[in-house]
Curated annotation (Swiss-Prot):
Functions as a specific chaperone for YopN. It could facilitate the secretion and the subsequent translocation of YopN. One of its GO terms (biological process) is protein secretion by the type III secretion system. InterPro entries: T3SS_YscB, Tir_chaperone. Keywords: Cell inner membrane, Cell membrane, Chaperone, Cytoplasm, Membrane, Plasmid. This is Chaperone protein YscB. It is found in: Cytoplasm; Cell inner membrane. GO terms for cellular component: cytoplasm; plasma membrane.
């Protein structure tokens, strides 16, 4: 895994990545946080998503969550990413990759897919974009 991340840093023109105390590598790419962490034989990519529209007070907006989950199912055949709620109830875009089958190019592709999905999801989760879609502007 160290060689994989070393090669990724080089291909991105960055200094070698350094893990935090929990062993998580935190990359900021196009203003998005992408966390990479080894988990057994997998590399887990996680990006927390600020989703103010997902909460209605102390409850979850079930309609929006259902829509997001349907989208995740639709892209599942093309992308390794899925949407999960973490222990705190925060929405996270996550991909689990087998380290044994992963090379630098493959990791870059998955990170690019992660960023593309974020660009698709985030406008759906911000109050301004929801208001403009329903004509409140």
């Amino acid at each position: 895994m160290q060689n994989l991340l070393k090669n990724l840093a080089a291909s991105l023109g960055r200094k070698p990545f350094v893990a935090d105390k929990q062993g998580v590598y935190r990359l900021t790419i196009d203003k998005h946080l992408v966390m990479l962490a080894p988990h057994g034989s997998e590399l887990v990519l996680r990006t927390p998503i600020d989703a103010p529209m997902l909460r209605e007070g102390n409850n979850v907006n079930v309609t929006l969550l259902r829509s997001l989950m349907q989208q995740a199912l639709a892209w599942a055949k093309r992308y390794p990413q899925t949407l999960v709620l973490d222990d705190c109830g925060q929405l996270v875009l996550e991909a689990r990759l087998r380290l044994q089958e992963l090379d630098t190019h493959g990791l870059q592709e998955v990170i690019n897919k992660q960023l593309a999905l974020l660009e698709h999801l985030i406008p759906q989760l911000t109050p301004f974009s929801v208001a403009s879609r329903v004509g409140w502007n």
